[in-house]
Amino acid sequence: MTKGETISIGEWKVVKGEGVLRTCGLGSCIGIVLYDQERVIAGMVHVMLPDSTKARKGANPWRYADTAIASLQAELKKQGARKLCAKMAGGAQMFKHAVKREFMQIGERNAAAARETLARLGITLVAEDIGGTKGRTIQYDVKTGELAVRTVHHGQMIL
């Protein structure tokens, strides 16, 4: 994986033309890429939680799947994107003891919220690598449209 624009938890970035977007440390968090391949523009966000409705006033909206995806879509359209598609990875179950407690299944809930938000916004989810018990690092090449997903102890795959 090459270096590029790095996105941390609750952050987002947009790249036009050539460039790379990457995020590390995706455990239960999800890295979501929205892109317009024809216009060669993409944005990535690293979300931590599924739903902003119970967030404290003034909380960072980029940490929540429901608000982050909608905000990233608006930013990309403002910068010229038209037909957006999505790829995403992450959503692991990082704590074995939490499997029986639904509220602790953050990865699964993050993935469901992301899928639901993408569908509501009319954004096609083209590919995903979700779940499991291992952390991930992802890197999106804006020019080629490839999302490289590196999973701990499992190597790399291209979506």
Curated annotation (Swiss-Prot):
Keyword Signal recorded: no
Keywords carried by this UniProt record: Chemotaxis, Hydrolase
Record-listed E.C. numbers: 3.5.1.44
Record Gene3D superfamilies: 3.30.1330.200
Gene Ontology terms, MF aspect: protein-glutamine glutaminase activity
GO biological process, one term: chemotaxis
Xref: Pfam families: CheD
Job of this protein: Deamidates glutamine residues to glutamate on methyl-accepting chemotaxis receptors (MCPs). CheD-mediated MCP deamidation is required for productive communication of the conformational signals of the chemoreceptors to the CheA kinase.
PANTHER family: CHEMORECEPTOR GLUTAMINE DEAMIDASE CHED-RELATED
Subunit structure: Forms a complex with CheC.
Protein name (record): Chemoreceptor glutamine deamidase CheD
Name of the encoding gene: cheD
